[in-house]
Amino acid sequence: MVDAAVLEKLEAGFKKLEASDSKSLLKKYLTREVFDKLKTKKTPSFGSTLLDCIQSGLENHDSGVGIYAPDAEAYTVFADLFDPIIEDYHGGFKKTDKHPPKNFGDVDTLANLDPNGEYVISTRVRCGRSMQGYPFNPCLTEAQYKEMEQKVSTTLSSLEGELKGQFYPLTGMSKEVQQKLIDDHFLFKEGDRFLQAANACRFWPSGRGIYHNDNKTFLVWCNEEDHLRIISMQPGGDLGQVYRRLVHAVNEIEKRIPFSHDDRLGFLTFCPTNLGTTLRASVHIKLPKLAADRTKLEEVAGKFNLQVRGSTGEHTEAEGGVYDISNKRRMGLTEYDAVKEMNDGILELIKIEGSL
């Protein structure tokens, strides 16, 4: 049974959300009917409740989505809420749909988006992975955090060639190293209010760490929002090179760490927006003419399934006319197709900018 205090919190939170002018997907799909059906359910292995899934969205009415999965089973137990949100966010991925098997495609077919270096400042491709046998952030114990960090650190330390580098645990990290990594945009800070409210920051900084290779083009975040965020990036627009490095890294890590995967949803992540390929391919790009009107920029980007963010990440404004633009769709298509969609869209945006 779900205890009375949790039910009370749910009821109060639901009423507030209902009365709010929140634009979140949570508000859109959490009808009274769905709410009543799910409020007394729990996931079998970890006892996660509806509150664990939606408390961030109940607290932050300005959420875009407002829901997280406390453990892998939540996607099934609370499917009546997750499925419509997934379908809405991922461009019509229906509950009868199946995410295709992993396919990184032919990495050699992607080239430099901006060979003359006029528009693209940097290129980045990342994916998220969850380690099999562990729940997501809200259910992890401190001992599990430490055990996971140990596994990740050992695995990454054995990487060779271009991926060779060093693992820095957040615990006991000197202020200087910490600040340097933040300035490099490498380090993650303790979660924002959206993640805090989702209980994703417990036992901080235990079990959290960062790895980067010697030339700072390959990064792994351990236990930030997801168990693993694997990131390949470099200055300029050479998407082919960035993607090739990511694919190589993911394949190497997967040989040593089994990842959580679901036949229908693909690779499992804490936030439903990252499911499937989990892949986000992005550029920091200057498009001064298009960007003079952000609404117009977003409209054009939307046509190519691209998402526009401010240059310092989610929930931020653009600095100096530099935008972060990425593929929006991560589900129902292969890894290669997700990157290709971003590739084609960015080339179109550059073409439009050049013609203005």
Swiss-Prot record:
Keywords: ATP-binding, Kinase, Nucleotide-binding, Transferase. Substrate binds at G64, V65, G66, I67, Y68, E225, C271, E314. It is an enzyme of class 2 (transferase). GO terms for cellular component: extracellular space. It catalyses: L-arginine + ATP = N(omega)-phospho-L-arginine + ADP + H(+). Pfam families: ATP-gua_Ptrans, ATP-gua_PtransN. One of its GO terms (biological process) is phosphocreatine biosynthetic process. One of its GO terms (molecular function) is creatine kinase activity. Residues 119-356 form the Phosphagen kinase C-terminal domain. SUPFAM superfamilies: Glutamine synthetase/guanido kinase, Guanido kinase N-terminal domain. It comes from the Eukaryota. InterPro entries: ATP-guanido_PTrfase (IPR000749), ATP-guanido_PTrfase_AS (IPR022415), ATP-guanido_PTrfase_cat (IPR022414), ATP-guanido_PTrfase_N (IPR022413), ATP-guanido_PTrfase_N_sf (IPR036802), Gln_synth/guanido_kin_cat_dom (IPR014746). ATP binds at residues 122-126, 185, 229, 280-284, 309-314. Gene3D superfamilies: ATP:guanido phosphotransferase, N-terminal domain, Glutamine synthetase/guanido kinase, catalytic domain. The keyword Nucleotide-binding applies. PROSITE patterns: PHOSPHAGEN_KINASE (PS00112), PHOSPHAGEN_KINASE_C (PS51510), PHOSPHAGEN_KINASE_N (PS51509). Its EC number is 2.7.3.3. Belongs to the ATP:guanido phosphotransferase family. PANTHER family: ARGININE KINASE 1-RELATED, ARGININE OR CREATINE KINASE. This is Arginine kinase. It comes from Schistocerca americana.
